[in-house]
From Swiss-Prot:
Protein role: Muscle-specific component of the BAF complex, a multiprotein complex involved in transcriptional activation and repression of select genes by chromatin remodeling (alteration of DNA-nucleosome topology). Specifically binds acetylated lysines on histone 3 and 4 (H3K14ac, H3K9ac, H4K5ac, H4K8ac, H4K12ac, H4K16ac). In the complex, it acts as a tissue-specific anchor between histone acetylations and methylations and chromatin remodeling. It thereby probably plays an essential role in heart and skeletal muscle development. Belongs to the neuron-specific chromatin remodeling complex (nBAF complex).
Tissue spec. comment: Expressed in the heart and somites. Expressed in cerebellum and spinal cord, but not in cerebral cortex. Expressed specifically in post-mitotic neurons (at protein level).
Single GO BP term: muscle organ development
Ranges of biased composition (kind: Acidic residues): 148-163
Keywords: Activator, Chromatin regulator, Isopeptide bond, Metal-binding, Myogenesis, Neurogenesis, Nucleus, Phosphoprotein, Repeat, Repressor, Transcription, Transcription regulation, Ubl conjugation, Zinc, Zinc-finger
Region (Disordered) location: 146-193, 225-254
Protein name: Zinc finger protein DPF3
Family from the record: Belongs to the requiem/DPF family.
Basic residues composition-biased segments: 168-186
Glycyl lysine isopeptide (Lys-Gly) (interchain with G-Cter in SUMO2) cross-link site: K99
Domain of life: Eukaryota
Domain free text: The PHD-type zinc fingers mediate the binding to acetylated histones.
Amino acid sequence: MATVIHNPLKALGDQFYKEAIEHCRSYNSRLCAERSVRLPFLDSQTGVAQNNCYIWMEKRHRGPGLAPGQLYTYPARCWRKKRRLHPPEDPKLRLLEIKPEVELPLKKDGFTSESTTLEALLRGEGVEKKVDAREEESIQEIQRVLENDENVEEGNEEEDLEEDVPKRKNRTRGRARGSAGGRRRHDAASQEDHDKPYVCDICGKRYKNRPGLSYHYAHTHLASEEGDEAQDQETRSPPNHRNENHRPQKGPDGTVIPNNYCDFCLGGSNMNKKSGRPEELVSCADCGRSGHPTCLQFTLNMTEAVKTYKWQCIECKSCILCGTSENDDQLLFCDDCDRGYHMYCLNPPVAEPPEGSWSCHLCWELLKEKASAFGCQA
């Protein structure tokens, strides 16, 4: 037969008992808060639809024990049934009678009755979803418990996130709160700037290598720029120079006469309209298009190299080895001289574009360790 403990505090100790009760209360509060977040749900193990109920009590509801061995008592709460509106009994919630299609455009009473029905339904939902003050207080208590637990674990979570960032630097980063999230976003931006140094000055898109940026220029911005330049030339140029962009002008010796303006900023050699400084133009040997090296995103090596051979713009670019411009999606551009090479014309052939910078064999022999791909290309 079980013995009744009249005063359990003496058997366990006052401090131990208070700590045990506090831990039990904290655990039950967290458990109830987590369960209330998921309500209502269908329990897959028991097949019971779990819903909110009124069996949970708060600390302020405690009362002294009445029976021997009873520590606390809680007030009984009467069961109550939710108030519901029954459509058959409510005169405002009558079903609309089906009218012939001919009478629908003639009578507008259907619309008014329909709006009245909707308003009544909304009022019914408001009556059904009313929550008394005690239930709101219990919800607030649950939220306070969850917030306290989050504040305790916030420091540990941020430390774990800081340790995980280097391992997941190539994955999409989630938003973190506090200054740590700002630092991580700044580090992610600087890492992206380092990995993709070639940036489009028109839309700001970044690329790992120069061929990708050139392809982006050719297929995204060059066509729209040609249309804008043609309109500007029609409004500002004489009629005999309207087709200057489409038909290259040739001199007496048969060479193409280069344009005296940049196709990107429309400035001349005396001034780059983007930087405001004088800059020498680089012209295409086939069509005569010109551009500033900075507008073309040229490096120092590339700016010096294009003066040593007949440079071609992205529209006229052809393979140096085979001399054709077919299969332009297979063209590789050297990051030091901007020459084009088919991947299948190289020796040995290349199946996929290399990651990072790429230098041709001519630049390797000329620049050696100063080549852009030095240390990146085997």
